[in-house]
Amino acid sequence: MKLTRDFPSNYTMAQWQPSDHQDAQVVGELFSHFGAERFTVQSTRTGVPVIWLARELLLDVVGFLRKLPSPFVMLYDLSATDERLRSHRDGLPQSDFTVFYHFISIDRNADVMLKVPLAESDLHLPTLTGHFPNANWYEREVWDLLGITFDGHPHLTRIMMPKSWQGHPLRKDYPARATEFDPFMLDAAKQDMEQENLLFKPEEWGMARGNENEDYMFLNLGPNHPSAHGAFRLVLQLDGEEIRNCVPDIGYHHRGAEKMGERQSWHSYIPYTDRVEYLGGVMNNLPYVLAVEKLAGIKVPNRVDVIRVMMAELFRIQSHLLFLGTYIQDVGAMTPVFFTFTDRQKIYTIIEAITGARMHPAWFRIGGVAHDLPKGWQRLVQDNLLSWLPKRLMDYEKAAMRNSILRGRTIGVSAYTTEQALAWGTTGAGLRATGLNFDVRKWRPYSGYDQFDFEVPVGSNGDAYDRATVRIEEIRQSLSIIEQCMKNMPEGPFKADHPLTTPPPKDRTLQDIETLITHFLQVSWGPVMPAAESFQMIEATKGINSYYLTSDGSTMSYRTRIRTPSFAHLQQIPSVIKGSMVSDLIVYLGSIDFVMSDVDR
């Protein structure tokens, strides 16, 4: 285990002002190699160069980005937008549907987003699975939800919706409310069809059968299995205890979170973000409200930044404690999970006193937080957390992490390299366990994290043991950050003085009718955000979580793209676990620390 404070100094915090990033190094490299006339550079509030190019150029450009001296080694996100109803598209290429690709270069600490316009009559693109293996699930999701075909894809099938589903839900002409559908009817013929679809056929999953003398055993692990940690199914192809092949099956927890973003106001969507990763609490609010604040041009007061950081770190500790208890339980020890739940209850006491709720406070607001900190909050933080948890962590390390059985079950198990992690889009503790110091709070500071003194724990072996030890040390660093928040909490307002702060400060509404009207409109109809695009990533509990928002100058988002870490982490499972035992798979699943709501959205 190593602790490091080193992080690149070349990163400038993205401001809300629009920019086309024409001066970005990667833009110059693309212009020089391919010619500037082949690209359109879009001005956005994402903080990332956004470059439009023709479909025919896509594979060449992606290959070029991978071979640069400081290459773009991670396909961070891939999704699409139905542009057919969008009004504000001045200066952009004609497009009915737009597919966007978000790449990250670790060496540069820089991103680039490529956009490819498509006509409704020809929704085809070449697959990127030959360049990035994690493009597989992202392309399946785009086909499933928007109906765009990726030629050459090895297994282009539904991933979120059931096999028998009709239509593509993220299209603008697809209903967003249950009342817009015909009444649901299940006759005998349809029931028979659904039962037929549930039959397991190995060939449909890309699994080989045996020969006339022997065959493999096929085992369903889930979708209701305690070690699956949620509604998650793994189909295993076994040769005895050895896993020859493995196919994850997701979508059982899909709730249409991105579609909901198109019919909720910017303000009323905040509670939905709480439930994307239901252990993260206000941590889930943070990337969303930061992205909206970029759209609005809101700079929050220093007190708001520090309050948000403190609350986010409280939920990080909560999540890591649940991971620790259940992980040790998966390996075979029962006692620690009861201790970690006792610790979590103490933290919930703090959270409830501050926000009024426990797991899903929905407490952050556009331009601030719901209300100021209550009297006596420092005593709660000190007594329930800072004076209690450090000693408990030492007990966990002695009782569990140094236990010979746990070490024997986890050291060297389900290990992968930094290069493999980047290829699959792995972030968070799963990436840092391989030895790479990449923490967004340090590399790309947001909400004032650059003002805090903390270290980034990294591992060295990238195995199940390192993933646990990294998270334990992250709890210690979070405790340090919370203590700094408590001792250095700035004075000042808990909301920004800005017309789009939602809801506006209540006391102002009692002084003049104009402010009262503004308050009424923003709470009922919602604030109107400028037509623009914004993006914000944060270091969430499970890895990097981000929101990419498109505003068309309305009270609601035109497109809400939620990139979650757990989706990428589950896609990596087959590449890591093939050739291992089933017992090792249980350890691996526990070490990932995923939540199915985070996967399925």
UniProtKB/Swiss-Prot annotation:
InterPro entries: NADH_DH_suC, NADH_DH_suCD, NADH_Q_OxRdtase_suD, NADH_quin_OxRdtase_su_C/D-like, NADH_UbQ_OxRdtase_30kDa_su, NADH_UbQ_OxRdtase_49kDa_CS, NDH1_su_D/H, NiFe-Hase_large. Residues 1-191 are annotated as: NADH dehydrogenase I subunit C. Its EC number is 7.1.1.-. It catalyses: a quinone + NADH + 5 H(+)(in) = a quinol + NAD(+) + 4 H(+)(out). It is found in: Cell inner membrane. Keywords: Cell inner membrane, Cell membrane, Membrane, Multifunctional enzyme, NAD, Quinone, Translocase, Transport, Ubiquinone. GO terms for molecular function: NAD binding; NADH dehydrogenase (ubiquinone) activity; NADH:ubiquinone reductase (non-electrogenic) activity; quinone binding. GO terms for cellular component: NADH dehydrogenase complex; plasma membrane. Residues 215-601 are annotated as: NADH dehydrogenase I subunit D. It is a peripheral membrane protein. Pfam families: Complex1_30kDa, Complex1_49kDa. NCBIfam families: NuoC_fam, NuoD, PRK06075.1, PRK11742.1. NDH-1 shuttles electrons from NADH, via FMN and iron-sulfur (Fe-S) centers, to quinones in the respiratory chain. The immediate electron acceptor for the enzyme in this species is believed to be ubiquinone. Couples the redox reaction to proton translocation (for every two electrons transferred, four hydrogen ions are translocated across the cytoplasmic membrane), and thus conserves the redox energy in a proton gradient. In the N-terminal section; belongs to the complex I 30 kDa subunit family. In the C-terminal section; belongs to the complex I 49 kDa subunit family. NDH-1 is composed of 13 different subunits. Subunits NuoB, CD, E, F, and G constitute the peripheral sector of the complex. This is NADH-quinone oxidoreductase subunit C/D. It comes from Aeromonas salmonicida (strain A449). The gene is nuoC.
